[in-house]
């Protein structure tokens, strides 16, 4: 009993610090598949709301999209961690993300006592998007090659008034990462990047990115517990990071530069990873910050 009391006392300063603040959580990976992890995620979100924090959930769905594409005999191709998306693939992406996964998450949270509302970026023009251009650099003396990866977008603008209205109504937004272009075209947007832009637009206290590894790993596979923006940018430049970790770290950098206080990349395979990150001294995963305490900013 004393140990349990100690846990509550440890959480108290964090509850005070984040009361009334916004925390954006990117939900994805194994935490969306294993039943125990799904339950712990939903409980974490509901508890945050009950103690006065405003959680905003942005979800992925890459594996589920991949399985659906495979069922219809369509191959999945990736470039720089992004899914190459033609018109047929976009239809599947939207169906799986906005029509299936989003509603499952809403139902899961509501079943545990929350009041979640599902949205895609097309609802109320929540996420205005433009086509994403990917560049492949060949060398110092050559112009970069522009790679067309189809209907893959990047966030142009987030209409935060919708999210403010939901938060004011004691509701928990659950957002599918589908955006809308100027001509009404639909874009598939990486969920990490959507979460980062939303966190920046809301000036969130924290952005938490859930993944299927311990956090950011170095070249030897060891966990890096803390990175500054400059160190994270170096890791991107020297190709220490691979695959899906690339957009996560880029998202963290963008969010911090947009005013988010701190970003955490956490192991979603750990039950209650969100609560451990926010309400304990040790935390989990990798934290990314603008500068370390005491570091000169120039």
Swiss-Prot record:
Its EC number is 2.7.2.8. The keyword Endoplasmic reticulum does not apply. Substrate binds at residues 61-62, 83, 188. InterPro entries: AceGlu_kinase-like_sf, AcgluKinase_fam, ArgB, Asp/Glu/Uridylate_kinase, Glu/AcGlu_kinase, NAGK-C. It comes from the Bacteria. One of its GO terms (biological process) is L-arginine biosynthetic process. It is found in: Cytoplasm. The record marks 26, 248 as: Transition state stabilizer. Pathway: Amino-acid biosynthesis; L-arginine biosynthesis; N(2)-acetyl-L-ornithine from L-glutamate: step 2/4. One of its GO terms (cellular component) is cytoplasm. GO terms for molecular function: acetylglutamate kinase activity; ATP binding. It catalyses: N-acetyl-L-glutamate + ATP = N-acetyl-L-glutamyl 5-phosphate + ADP. Keywords: Amino-acid biosynthesis, Arginine biosynthesis, ATP-binding, Cytoplasm, Kinase, Nucleotide-binding, Transferase. Its main location: cytoplasm. Catalyzes the ATP-dependent phosphorylation of N-acetyl-L-glutamate. Belongs to the acetylglutamate kinase family. ArgB subfamily. This is Acetylglutamate kinase. It comes from Syntrophobacter fumaroxidans (strain DSM 10017 / MPOB). The gene is argB.
